Amino acid sequence: MKNILAKAPSKSGTYAMFIGRWQPWHDGHRWLIHQALNEDKKVLLCVRDVPVSESNPWTADQILLNLADSLKDLIEQGHVKIMKIPDIESVNIGRGVGYDVIEHVPPQEIHDISATKIREQMKQEGKL
């Protein structure tokens, strides 16, 4: 796994960072990272290492493998890096930190995508 994570050579050293559980990775997440990719930014996806539970049925390592498979081409092309981080309780910044804090507001059809509903459907279909 480390080879995949380390493969993203960059034209510049900066990334648009997204922190999440990605449980599961879905079209809403894809839309979100493509907002940065469409602006020719590289993306760093941080997978929170949360305890397995009903709302987090996969381990962070399983999510990393899923992301590596789903985003293989973007990773190999150097557009995306993925990494596991410890679970967090907040994101804190100071003034003049040297980067922007950006909120992407999705269109309604993307906003309506729910990982909770996806997990419930997967349970009903015996996939979880």
Residue ranges with predicted function:
Residues M1-L128:
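Nucleotidyltransferase catalytic core that binds NTPs
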